[in-house]
Curated annotation (Swiss-Prot):
Belongs to the chitin synthase family. Class III subfamily. This is Chitin synthase 2. InterPro entries: Chitin_synth, Chitin_synth_fun. Pfam families: Chitin_synth_1 (PF01644). GO terms for cellular component: cell septum; plasma membrane.
């Protein structure tokens, strides 16, 4: 739950940075910027899914426990899809962040789709769900893939988007990953981080 919360809260902060842009030929035309962004979560199987993570998703409104069916009209369910627009976020420390005013520090509405696959079919199958299912319907300009636990830096998603927007011949891009060193670099004591 901490890893998913860290990533989702970082994404929502990045969307806030995009919404707060004052000068933009793309984001400020044809409606609010947040309406041009969709966050898709794909979880690989109900059984391996951490129940505390589902509680976090229920807290922000994207998951509803008790509405899933194992089969419909005798056919086994392949995936459960939830859709919701929320301004709620949960930090990695499990603090609930709510909208407080219309100021620049308030998180904007974020359109979310959550696909919980019935069976664990591995990561590549999850990518296929994103590109073949959601991608065909949404027809996005770009897709940014993040693993749970990855915290996008300040304006990092905007920087990735700008790379594609400014170069129509660009086919792929990647960000830079930094280890989270912790306060006073205390995480360097852990040999896996160091």
């Amino acid at each position: 739950k901490m890893l998913t919360s860290r990533t989702l809260h970082g994404v929502m902060q990045n969307i806030r940075d995009i919404v707060n842009l004052k000068k933009s030929e793309f984001w400020n035309k044809g409606g609010p910027a947040w309406q041009k962004i969709a966050v898709c979560l794909v979880f690989d199987g109900i059984d391996p899914c951490d129940k505390d993570t589902l509680d976090v998703l229920a807290t922000i409104g994207i998951y509803q426990d008790g509405v899933m069916k194992k089969d419909v009209d005798g056919k086994e369910t392949i995936a459960h899809i939830f859709e919701y627009t929320t301004q709620l976020s949960v930090t990695a420390n499990q603090q609930l962040i709510r909208p407080h005013d219309d100021g620049p520090s308030t998180l904007p509405p974020v359109q979310m789709m959550f696909c919980l696959k019935q069976k664990n079919s591995k990561k590549i199958n999850s990518h296929r769900w994103l590109f073949n299912a959601f991608g065909r319907i949404l027809n996005p300009e770009i897709c940014i893939l993040l693993d749970a636990g990855t915290k996008p830096g300040h304006k990092s998603l905007l920087a990735l988007w700008e790379a594609f927007y400014n170069d129509k011949d660009l086919g792929g891009s990647c960000g830079e990953i930094h280890a989270m060193l912790g306060k006073g670099w205390k995480n360097l004591i852990n040999p896996l981080v160091a």
